[in-house]
Design a protein with these regions (language model features):
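Adenine nucleotide-associated cytosolic modules
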Residues: 1-251
Length: 251
């Protein structure tokens, strides 16, 4: 770390849970963010601000005016630009000291495997079931920690899934690859709800990368109407084709 790093990250360096050692770990880390929408936008901003050394940003979409209600990484000037291009430019202005890799593609197959293999942590910020299942399978196969979240309407959910997957994976809870009936396009979404989930993804990534303890292998459900949380603990089951299986029970 140099003098510029000490100045830039001074507020989080004051935390005993991070300090110099934790910050050095962040600077040496690589995070793959798949999806730059309502989840990936705040996650990318906070991880760039925190000094995660390399951010790989994957999305195959362009910025649309309807995105701006919740995707705070973008402005009206970015409309019709690739999200990865606009995101890299914005994040570079926020923190020019980190490496930003733009991947304008829907990651899958070999490309997904290669990017997951390079990452210390993967953030699933996508909005379709097939991609979520593919990301989960790649993370399990390559033993890469996965932080997955989603939000629709006034509800959100978050999971931190880590090897050796003794308490389950994403496929264990959602074995059906079909798309859910409710999504942001059909049921709507309030920006702060999805933003909260994306911010928590960034927080959990910072905790994992810096060596802090965190709540793993638990499905956390948020209800914005009551501002309440429910936690579902994962338990092993035998039928999962990805990791060997798990189920969830309320705690």
């Amino acid at each position: 770390m140099n003098d510029s790093d000490f100045m830039r990250y001074s507020r989080q360096l004051l935390l005993e849970d991070i300090a110099i050692e934790g910050q050095q770990k962040l600077l040496a880390s690589r995070v793959l963010i798949v999806g730059l929408g309502g989840l990936g936008s705040p996650a990318a901003l906070y991880l760039a601000g925190a000094g995660v050394g390399t951010l790989a940003l994957a999305d195959d979409d362009d910025v649309h005016v309807s995105n701006l209600q919740r995707q705070i990484l973008f402005t009206s000037d970015d409309i019709a630009q690739p999200k990865t291009t606009a995101a890299r430019a914005r994040l570079a202005r926020l923190n020019p000291q980190i490496e930003l890799i733009a991947l304008k593609q829907r990651l899958g197959g070999k490309a997904l495997q290669e990017e997951v293999a390079k990452a210390d942590v993967v953030l699933d910020c996508t909005d379709n079931m097939a991609t979520r299942q593919a990301i989960n399978a790649a993370c399990v196969a390559l033993k890469t920690p996965l932080i997955t979240a989603s939000a629709v309407g006034l509800g959100g959910q978050l999971m931190v899934l880590t090897p050796p997957w003794e308490q389950g994976c994403y496929r264990c809870l959602w074995p059906d690859a079909n798309e859910p009936e409710r999504n942001c396009r059909t049921a709507g979404i309030i920006g702060p709800v999805v933003g909260m989930m994306g911010t928590l993804q960034a927080l959990e990534a910072i905790k994992l990368l810096s060596g802090m303890e965190t709540e793993r292998n638990t499905l956390r459900l948020f209800d914005a109407r009551s501002s309440g949380w429910r936690h579902l603990a994962l338990h092993r089951a035998s039928h999962c084709p990805v990791c060997g299986g798990r189920d969830a029970h309320s705690v």
